[in-house]
Regions:
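Solvent-exposed, glycine/polar-rich loop segments of beta-barrel outer-membrane systems
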Residues: 72-74, 113-122, 153-169, 201-221, ...
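Short, structured loop/turn "capping" segments at alpha-beta junctions
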Residues: 186-192, 202-206, 237-240
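Solvent-exposed flexible segments
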Residues: 181, 196-202
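Alpha-helical membrane segments in multi-pass integral membrane proteins
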Residues: 190-198, 223, 243-245
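Outer-membrane beta-barrel porins/channels
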Residues: 178, 192-196, 210
């Protein structure tokens, strides 16, 4: 059947396809969040380790991800993210506070597939800036938080209705809070227990596709919790291995839009990423000298988000 009141250009299912782009873009922003709050925080802490209080220490983290998103239909996403930060530590009575302004960039491509075979694809990229902070207490307890904002640009194309395409730009905001405790098991082994809350919001946009129909995209919001633990084993003074498990729950992640033609308007079917994801991670860190540190990691996910990701971390001291 056709979308009620929207004319015969769009079948009910087909109207969902252009909205899947919002799901891909929101996931890219979340992957940027994940990079910052894992490898980014580790890098910031390592960058200031052994350095003078107040000195500025640059670090870079990068990740590449291949994800399959269950949105009711599904989206395949390939994304690359990067953070560049400048870490500084401030000693206090409880331990030390690490703060770092960060610049972030991400780009990727996606393919969306509806159950009826409709296929759409496109590209996305974003850039933004933010601030991260982490209080590390001497007893192993820590608290952390971050704020980010920037612009996301996406495009879409599909053979729906004889061929449609569009470009879209929107502002995004993101924040997170976390706390955890690092427990020293012995002189070589630690376990880090943590809980984190993530919030990401991408503003809406109104676009016109080639058929003359308009899509009025609502703002999309992601609200996630993540509970996990990571075990780290110090192989030597300069080498460490880690392995971790985490459970993530997405409370929202729905993308809504109103489709309008000369015959009227109707809501497009809404893709949603609400649900649970399990995450496993493995990694290795090496400190070759006082001036340079390297980290490599891999992660896999199952559930609402399925896929694999890789990250690379570099620290430089001057």
């Amino acid at each position: 059947g056709t979308t009620p009141g929207a004319g015969s250009h769009y079948a009910d299912a087909d109207a969902k396809s252009p909205v899947e782009t919002q799901s891909a873009a929101l996931t890219m922003l979340n992957l940027g969040h994940d990079l910052l709050t894992t490898a980014g925080y580790e890098n910031a802490a390592l960058a200031v380790d052994g350095e003078e209080e107040g000195s500025v220490n640059p670090f870079i983290t990068m990740s590449a991800n291949n994800q399959k998103l269950d949105t009711g239909s599904h989206v395949d996403l390939k994304a690359w993210n990067m953070n560049l930060g400048f870490a500084k530590k401030i000693n206090n009575n409880s331990g030390k506070l690490i703060i770092a302004p960060v610049i972030e960039y991400g780009r990727g491509s996606y393919d969306s597939y509806l159950d009826n075979g409709t296929h759409g694809d496109g590209d996305a990229h974003f850039w933004g800036a933010g601030l991260m902070a982490k209080q590390l207490n001497d007893d192993g307890l820590y608290y952390e938080g971050s704020l980010r904002a920037g612009r996301m640009s996406t495009d879409y194309q599909s053979a729906v209705a004889g061929g449609i395409k569009y470009d879209s730009d929107a502002t995004y905001y993101a924040a997170h809070l976390g706390m955890g405790k690092v427990v020293q098991l012995n002189d070589k082994d630690t376990i880090d227990y943590y809980g984190k809350l993530f919030y990401t919001r991408q503003q809406g946009d109104k676009i016109t596709v080639g058929t003359g129909a308009t899509y009025d995209f609502d703002a999309t919001t992601s609200l996630r919790t993540r509970l996990g633990a990571r075990y780290t084993h110090q192989l030597s003074e300069k080498n460490a291995l880690y392995a971790g498990l985490a459970w993530q729950h997405e409370f929202d992640g729905e993308s809504n839009a109103i489709v309008a033609t000369t015959l009227g308007s109707a809501s497009a079917p809404a893709p949603s990423m609400k649900g649970d994801t399990g995450i496993m991670e493995l990694g290795w860190r090496v400190n070759n000298s006082d001036k340079f540190e390297l980290g490599l990691g891999v992660n896999g996910s199952v559930g609402k988000q399925k896929g694999v990701g890789f990250n690379l971390s570099l620290n430089f001291s001057f």
